[in-house]
């Protein structure tokens, strides 16, 4: 992703068939394909920084609280570096990324409830929640292409007014 940008997308963790193989978040799997399509459709391709809350491949595809905590210092550094350049907007993909980011920024979970499309202000940092663009969420209909496009576009409009 872009080094100096106003929108940072924070996902869950490397996917077994995606970032775990490619070394790049959201590259090489269905989640990455959907994110790429939506970024192109919203005009945000090349204008975002993309990372994951957890840097290692989770054993059962869902990171443990220990894995999230162990990786929080890396997430904090990435967010701080992002804040140096912009008035940041963070698009949080899924509940794990949401909770990890709230914790990394020193917030209280109960003050920032996760909900798809929710927008939170946290000391000048805008947080936008989305369901994760996982194959499971898209196949079950929890997240449709249009829902994802709408939330990504909204985050982009906040980052680039």
Describe the residue ranges of each PLM region.
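A polyanion-binding, active-site-adjacent surface
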Residues: 1-114, 118-160
């Amino acid at each position: 992703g872009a080094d100096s940008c106003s929108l940072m997308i924070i996902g869950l963790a490397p996917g077994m068939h995606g970032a775990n193989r490619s070394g790049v978040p959201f590259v090489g799997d269905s989640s990455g394909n959907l994110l790429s399509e939506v970024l192109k459709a919203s005009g945000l391709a090349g204008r975002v920084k993309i990372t994951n809350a957890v840097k290692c491949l989770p054993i059962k595809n869902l990171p443990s609280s220990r894995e999230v905590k162990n990786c929080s210092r890396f997430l904090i550094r990435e967010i701080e570096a992002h804040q140096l350049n912009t008035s940041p907007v963070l698009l949080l993909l899924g509940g794990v990324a949401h909770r990890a980011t709230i914790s990394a920024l020193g917030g209280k979970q109960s003050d920032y409830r996760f909900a798809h499309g929710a927008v939170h202000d946290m000391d000048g940092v805008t947080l936008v929640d989305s369901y994760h663009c996982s194959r499971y969420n898209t196949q079950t209909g929890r997240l449709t292409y249009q829902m994802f496009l709408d939330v990504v576009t909204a985050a982009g409009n906040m980052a680039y007014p």
